Swiss-Prot record:
ATP binds at residues 30-33, 51, 87-91, 415, 480-482, 496. GO terms for molecular function: ATP binding; ATP-dependent protein folding chaperone; isomerase activity; unfolded protein binding. GO terms for biological process: protein refolding. Pfam families: Cpn60_TCP1 (PF00118). InterPro entries: Chaperonin_Cpn60_CS, Cpn60/GroEL, Cpn60/GroEL/TCP-1, GroEL-like_apical_dom_sf, GROEL-like_equatorial_sf, TCP-1-like_intermed_sf. Forms a cylinder of 14 subunits composed of two heptameric rings stacked back-to-back. Interacts with the co-chaperonin GroES. It comes from Glaesserella parasuis serovar 5 (strain SH0165) (Haemophilus parasuis). The keyword Secreted does not apply. Keywords: ATP-binding, Chaperone, Cytoplasm, Isomerase, Nucleotide-binding. This is Chaperonin GroEL. One of its GO terms (cellular component) is cytoplasm. PROSITE patterns: CHAPERONINS_CPN60. It catalyses: ATP + H2O + a folded polypeptide = ADP + phosphate + an unfolded polypeptide.
Length: 547
């Protein structure tokens, strides 16, 4: 086991604080509408330019191990805020730095760290409740656009795109961000249920100019097994041909004679058929087939429950208004499924999301909810260079998370104003059990001005003057750093999602409280490099040349 270096008391805290400040100072320059960029060197390729707090935090490793421990703990604040709300990482870092700096001053003055921490916790709990009461629901498209704009660093085109996407696919829909091909941002909306399986044979194509298969008012046969014998599906084919409608077959696979017969029938115009593989694998495939069945009011023909494909009737087939199949995707538009059953299925999947511990599973389940409930929107980010593309995608991602958080828990005045208002409201109400807890409460409430002050500093203004003016105001009165004007923050469209501010404050206070109560730090001693004997011997070999 390696030897350890141990530091106690003030020595440990001074080192830790230095690390906290290095990381926080690098992150906080990005805060606000006039926040600056940070350039990150990469081992391969061009440097990354970003205004995303968590991206900056993740890059920082300090040489001194004690300082690095402080930096890593603040990095944890940014990561936690990012995981919880997807945004607010810089705000969380600024708050953590402010609470740690104020708290360690009090510890150095001889206060009891545990009482300080209890005071901080009381203040934070009271402010969180106050933020919830200040919060108003985010309902209109305009408000969603404003939240997106603020989070994307005042880029109104991003705000508009996100608002349009949410309008199209609903608040439950999946919105993804991809690299665009041009210079302009674009929004691509897929309505209905889409899954990533294309046609099994190009001979099914009936729209050659688009290279797709389009079926109007088709029947949909859902089968939970491979089909290789045409006899199995003959009864269904005959019934569908009699009804004069097209047929889409979704099965684990269709091969050999069965596929060849379907192609021949389609080419001769006897019956219009298309076949695709079922999406997903294993249990997920079964679940997705069931989703399609509920969406189209059909039944999955499965041998597991004693059903036979030869005995399938036309009543067991699903139906939809339209199906479009490309080389890679199948989209089912306007399935005739019962709304009540679809809602019940969505509720069931939501319960699975809550119970799941795997992020991957949660993401896949959320996709299923979106496909049943609304649709999928893709925001394609346009940029002139790859460096700009990365930076812009980061901002669009942040804005997307912020708007989701706003829809979930509502909105409050932005620009750090809500924290200042909440802090001043609870200042007279929250009381500790002793004077040292009261000091903890006061320092936590004072630290809540830090985001406002940092936004103003980044805009090149005098922080203490603006902070005093904002504190003298009431309600949503605050300072717009973008236009350098005072006014009602909600009317000016400067909004923050309540969830983002709340989680930033809670995570910052949690880690800061732990750092204030730190009394000892332990790290590995650096290993001494042993002299390389081989190198010395190599020099002697050179003597041979002198002879």
């Amino acid at each position: 086991m390696a030897a350890k270096d141990v530091k106690f008391g003030n020595d440990a805290r001074v080192k830790m604080l230095k690390g906290v400040n290095v990381l926080a100072d690098a992150v906080k320059v990005t805060l606000g509408p006039k926040g600056r960029n940070v350039v990150l060197d990469k081992a391969f390729g061009a440097p990354t330019i970003t205004k995303d707090g968590v991206s900056v935090a993740r890059e920082i490793e300090l040489e001194d191990k004690f300082e690095n421990m402080g930096a890593q703990m603040v990095k944890e604040v940014a990561s936690k805020a990012n995981d919880a709300a997807g945004d607010g990482t810089t705000t969380a870092t600024v708050l953590a730095q402010a609470i740690v700096n104020e708290g360690l001053k009090a510890v150095a003055a001889g206060m009891n760290p545990m009482d300080l921490k209890r005071g901080i916790d009381k203040a934070v709990a009271a402010v969180v409740e106050e933020l919830k009461s200040l919060s108003k629901p985010c309902e209109t498209s305009k408000e969603i656009e404003q939240v997106g704009t603020i989070s994307a660093n005042s880029d109104s085109t991003v705000g508009k795109l996100i608002a349009q996407a949410m309008e199209k696919v609903g608040k439950e829909g999946v919105i993804t961000v991809e690299d665009g091909t041009g210079l302009e941002d674009a929004l691509d909306v897929v309505e209905g249920m889409q899954f990533d399986r294309g046609y099994l044979s190009p001979y099914f194509i009936n729209k050659p100019e688009a290279g797709t298969v389009e079926l109007e008012n088709p029947y949909i046969l859902l089968v939970d097994k491979k089909i290789s014998n045409i006899r199995e599906i003959l009864p269904v084919l005959e019934a569908v041909a009699k009804a004069g409608k097209p047929l889409l077959i979704i099965a684990e696979d269709i091969e050999g004679e069965a596929l060849a017969t379907l192609v021949v029938n389609t080419m001769r115009g006897i019956v219009k058929v298309a076949a695709v593989k079922a999406p997903g694998f294993g249990d997920r495939r079964k679940a997705m087939l069931q989703d399609i069945a509920i969406l189209t009011a059909g039944t999955v023909i499965s041998e597991e429950i004693g059903m036979e494909l030869e005995k399938a009737t036309i009543e067991e087939l699903g139906q939809a208004k339209r199906v479009v199949i490309s080389k890679d995707n199948t989209t089912i538009i306007d399935g005739v499924g019962d709304e009540v059953q679809i809602k019940a299925r969505v509720a069931q999947i939501r319960q699975q999301i809550e119970d799941s511990t795997s992020d991957y599973d949660k993401e896949k389940l959320q996709e299923r909810v979106a496909k049943l409930a609304g649709g999928v929107a893709v925001i394609k980010v346009g940029a002139a260079t790859e460096v700009e593309m990365k930076e812009k995608k980061d901002r669009v991602d942040d804005a997307l998370h912020a708007t989701r958080a706003a829809v979930e828990e509502g909105i409050i005045a932005g620009g750090g104003v809500a924290l200042v208002r909440a802090a001043s409201k609870v200042a007279d109400v929250v009381k500790g059990d002793n004077e040292e807890q009261n000091v903890g409460i006061r320092l936590a409430l004072r630290a809540m001005e830090a985001p406002l002050r940092q936004i103003v500093t980044n805009a090149g203004e005098e922080a203490s003057v603006v902070a005093r003016n904002v504190k003298d105001g009431n309600g949503n009165y605050g300072y717009n750093a973008a236009t350098e004007q005072y006014g009602d923050m909600l009317e000016m469209g400067i909004l923050d999602p309540t969830k983002v501010t709340r989680s930033a404050l809670q995570f910052a206070a949690s880690i800061a409280g732990l750092m204030i109560t730190t009394e000892c730090m332990v790290t590995d001693l650096p290993k001494e490099e042993k002299a390389d004997l081989g190198a010395g011997m190599g020099g002697m070999g050179g003597m041979g040349g002198m002879m």
